[in-house]
Curated annotation (Swiss-Prot):
It comes from the Bacteria. GO terms for molecular function: acetoacetate decarboxylase activity. The keyword Lyase applies. Its EC number is 4.1.1.4. InterPro entries: Acetoacetate_decarboxylase, Acetoacetate_decarboxylase_bac, ADC_dom_sf. It comes from Bordetella avium (strain 197N). This is Acetoacetate decarboxylase. The keyword Lyase applies. Catalyzes the conversion of acetoacetate to acetone and carbon dioxide. The active site is at K116. Keywords: Decarboxylase, Lyase, Schiff base.
């Protein structure tokens, strides 16, 4: 294979069989279970990178079922998203995500900078209860529950929430382990259609784990929960801050 061919085909690894395809990345009937809780503000400030600003001591703990996603397949994800502001505009910073499918782990990390690790999340309905769990190896590190569809929620408001900017800290090391890329990335969800949204009484339990430290942002009080289903496209990102720029 000559050098020009390598350059022309260099999208992702392996060169001759990339771990994920080029987009667009469309998600159909994506199901969200989001528990919002109050946590320690100092713990939040210690993990959110400047120039993002923490404005309130809240965390959104998410369980997400993705049964139909372009190129990524059928998988489940769980993790923590933090409300922030950037240049006075409200958005969300993705702190940590855990999922059970390699292509979105590889693509998420390499393209956007999603902080994804391999684990075993689930999201199911058990009789009258919506239940989300996260296992890291044999250890249960998160359990979320909510009364199933107790109250309807405005789908226009849910679409507005989904349309807000999202932020990621993308880090790619050089071959000598020094940082080659260290960037704050902004992306948006696009072409959003919300089918339905609901709320209900909710509870969240987080357990300590050395390699899945979700409990480092402790649950002090559950302040709300949402369950909704939507179609959306995961938009490509843009670099808004380069930490290595001189």
């Amino acid at each position: 294979m000559n050098i020009d061919t390598v350059r022309a085909n260099a999208f992702a690894m392996p060169l001759t069989s990339p771990a994920f395809p080029m987009g667009p990345y469309r998600f159909v009937k994506r199901e969200f279970f989001v528990i919002t809780y109050r946590t320690d503000p100092e713990a939040l400030r210690s993990v959110v990178p400047e120039p993002l600003a923490v404005t309130q001591p809240l965390v959104h703990y998410e369980f997400i079922r993705m049964p139909d996603s372009t190129g990524f397949g059928d998988y489940t994800e769980s993790g923590q998203v933090i409300p922030v502001e950037y240049e006075g505009v409200a958005g969300s910073y993705t702190h940590a995500m855990y999922l059970n499918d390699h292509p979105p782990i590889a693509g998420g990390r390499e393209l956007w900078g999603f902080p994804k690790k391999l684990a075993l999340p689930t999201l199911k309905v058990h009789t009258d209860t919506l239940v989300g769990t996260l296992d890291y190896g044999p250890i249960r590190v998160a359990t979320g529950t909510m009364g199933y569809k107790h109250e309807e929620v405005d789908i226009v408001e849910q679409a507005r929430h989904l349309s807000a900017p999202n932020f990621l800290l993308k880090i790619i090391p050089h071959v000598d382990c020094s940082p080659r890329i260290c960037e704050l990335v902004r992306y948006y969800l696009e072409d959003i259609r919300v089918y339905g949204a609901w709320s209900g009484p909710a509870a969240l339990e987080l357990a300590p784990h050395a390699l899945a430290p979700v409990a480092d942002l402790p649950v002090l009080e559950v302040v709300g929960a949402r369950h909704f289903i939507a179609d959306l496209t995961l938009g490509l990102g843009e670099v808004v801050y380069d930490y290595l720029a001189k």
